């Protein structure tokens, strides 16, 4: 079923079931195929598009006004956009923000990302919920010429994210040190001066703001590629190990990540902290399992309950897989749970400073309710040193 309210659309989004959404194209021209998700955040579209966790996905923004504050290099979560494409309600207006360095349209075009505006995003979001993150093809042609049969075939031919190890595509090529802290007015980004803890961060697709939060918590951060071995991690003599966010199927990434994590847990007593994909990697290493969600959690307004304190945190989330809490073995405690659907959002080992959360405590975009987790990681390293 096609929806074509325009006399000459220049872009179209084609779902695998044959549904077509027409609109106005912007950004790069061409076509791409991916899994379709929706994000409910009102701000932070630049951080979302550059979040490595969105590899292999086209993002539908439910908030209608996207692009009105432009983009600035300071807000990139990685060097280039990683999300495969963008779907918005309204065609972006001119940027109005003192920090804006570039218009969204030009930024997307320069970075090779396709976008479509003028789409009924409420109807599309309903389709995503009903179909469960459908496979889609997105095309942008200034002449408005589309081969719908070929686009439907392309959408149906997309393999999907299950079984895909995308961390290898977005991880760093070699190790590096990170010392930039969180943005603060009026200084901007400052460099740390006297870090207390040596931390090795495994980069499955790490956001820059996660690394900044670690640095702001007193961590001297060395980032290693996703395929780093336990020996390579321990060669840096860390006080703690951090497992980052990232894209794809955790079971696929776990083929090489889980053995490394298990060796760290079996041979050391180091504190370990994981976020998002890192949370899933830790759960797999401890004997749990992960499952594909219907349409995932993507937004900056997700309520999560801390099961140990009873407090509710409003969190930022971006994941299409979840840890099956029923699969967690003895000695692993579920600590956080989504108040939207009851899915697992946090675990810890009962006798060791090893913990992780499914959501993003660094936010960017989103609320700052959960920054205490970085401080908890630093406190665990302090306590570990005091015992030596």
Curated annotation (Swiss-Prot):
Q: Which Pfam families match?
A: CPSase_sm_chain (PF00988), GATase (PF00117)
Looking up CDD domains in the UniProt record yields:
GATase1_CPSase
Q: Identify the keywords attached in UniProt to this record, alphabetized.
A: Amino-acid biosynthesis, Arginine biosynthesis, ATP-binding, Glutamine amidotransferase, Ligase, Nucleotide-binding, Pyrimidine biosynthesis
Write out the residues that bind L-glutamine. Answer: 53, 246, 248, 277, 280, 318, 320-321
Q: How does it assemble?
A: Composed of two chains; the small (or glutamine) chain promotes the hydrolysis of glutamine to ammonia, which is used by the large (or ammonia) chain to synthesize carbamoyl phosphate. Tetramer of heterodimers (alpha,beta)4.
Its biological purpose is as follows:
Small subunit of the glutamine-dependent carbamoyl phosphate synthetase (CPSase). CPSase catalyzes the formation of carbamoyl phosphate from the ammonia moiety of glutamine, carbonate, and phosphate donated by ATP, constituting the first step of 2 biosynthetic pathways, one leading to arginine and/or urea and the other to pyrimidine nucleotides. The small subunit (glutamine amidotransferase) binds and cleaves glutamine to supply the large subunit with the substrate ammonia.
HAMAP family assigned to the protein according to its UniProt record, in alphabetical order: CPSase_S_chain
The family note in this entry says: Belongs to the CarA family.
Q: What is the name attached to this protein's record?
A: Carbamoyl phosphate synthase small chain
Native source species:
Ruegeria pomeroyi (strain ATCC 700808 / DSM 15171 / DSS-3) (Silicibacter pomeroyi)
